[in-house]
Amino acid sequence: MWNIRRGKQRREYSILKKQTALILSVLACLSFLISSCGKIETKEIENENSHDNVEFIPKSKPAGSEAKYKISLEMDEKGKFRVNSTSKIKNISTDHWKELVFYFIPNIFTKPNSPQLATPSYVSIKSIKVDGEKVKFNLEKDTLKIKLGQELKPNHEVIVNVQYDFTLPKKGLRFTANEKNYFLAQWYPMIATYRDHKWNKEDYRMRGETYHTAFSDFEIQYKLSNNLTIISSSDDDTYPSGKSGILVGKDIKDFYIALLKEPNVVEKKIGNITIRVFGVDDRKDLHKDIMKLAIDALTYFQDTIGPYPHKQLDIILDELGMEYPGVVTANSIYRGTPVDEDSLKSMVIHEIAHQWFYGVISNDPYHDAWLDEGLANFASRLFYAQYQGEEITVNEEMYKDFPLPVNLSLDEYSLKEQSTYIYGKSQEMLWKVFQENKGEQQAENFLGEYYENYKFKEIDTNEFIRFLKNYLNLNNDSYFEGWIKLEK
């Protein structure tokens, strides 16, 4: 167990720093007024923390589109789902829209798009309406384009209704099912972001996250025919679950649902946050160990970065490691074999860190994947340094054969090397910057300030570097040469 007082000291340091900045600003104004009257001659005071004297104004990337979702979800005894999705879409760009573009990821796992799957998904769109009128649409792979009868002007909105049925594939990616459980990731039509006068929608890839959505509000009404435990991005789901109910999510990037049959459940309450671990194997002692680790990680991340944004943290020990608002998954079993405990625990910590880097501070995971993956690894590394009492070291030599920048778009990396850049090289080189600028304590303070400036905003690489340079008082880009591609 690390010293929790350190987190409090960091918060106190941050408050003191802001108070000091305010006092210095007031004194500077008074000095100017006095000197302008010719009464006292003052000298400019130099301060090594120049960012304390100059207010930094964060710049977020606008989403271009805004959505509120109201969805009904029904499941029959055979595992077939029926969905009625109604979304209020608002144009918050400066352009007039002739069409709407949605991600519709269930279609990627149908037989035509995933012929390698022995049990693909089934998808059937029954109707699409805009403001109550049926419209033409085109569905190709995971891209759903809906034609508008008349242009949608800036600051205007439309109501889009999509009715469809689907089944889950077996051995899909995140959107999948196994013998007992159902995992509904990106299961509804998700409006894309809009920027640079076009829809920001990229082709689906089987590695990395290719979907990018803005913060939205959700209301999900569900009805199940089977006795399943429902776990979701809402704080309203309970254990044991009922067969029907309403789930609400506010200011979240997407809405995840898992349906589990008879999981082993470990539950603890830490302050006003309930942590729940759902295990699907018989390693009950491991599930308890994961709970202890999750409590430590949540406490550290809250003390270091900022408040956890939900009332529940659900950890599902099944399926691949992945983050969703309020939920993380980590595969305790891979290809029929139990995953070793250390790997599983590391996976859980990384995904919990994503609740801040992705869940609260947003970035485009196709064009700036390193900003959430690299920062999640960076924060996890700091946690383990405290948790295990180990010194953090830099090993640049490990990445000498990987010369590309870490902030390229996913399609600019080979599938084999993509993770090495996004997860590995990014956090290693970022740690080198802090190693040469006051080290671990500075890194922890930075994460808190970063969160405070960009919570519920979207950031890109250039803005991250602008903030980092301001925070560390860096006068040039020499620290980023060779690993960051900066726009001039």
Model-derived segments and their meaning:
Residues 89-93:
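Asparagine-centered strand-capping/turn motif at beta-strand->loop junctions
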Residues 220, 246, 264-355, 359-364, ...:
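Juxtacatalytic substrate-recognition/specificity segment
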Residues 117-181:
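A surface-exposed beta-strand-loop module
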Residues 28, 37-82:
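N-terminal, polar/Ser/Thr-rich
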Residues 327-336, 368-406, 480:
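Post-HExxH zinc-binding segment in Zn-dependent metallohydrolases
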Residues 49, 99-133, 185, 223, ...:
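Solvent-exposed beta-hairpin/edge-strand motifs
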Residues 426-488:
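Amphipathic alpha-helical substructures
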Residues 126, 163-256:
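Extended, low-hydrophobicity, Ser/Thr/Pro/Gly-biased non-transmembrane segments
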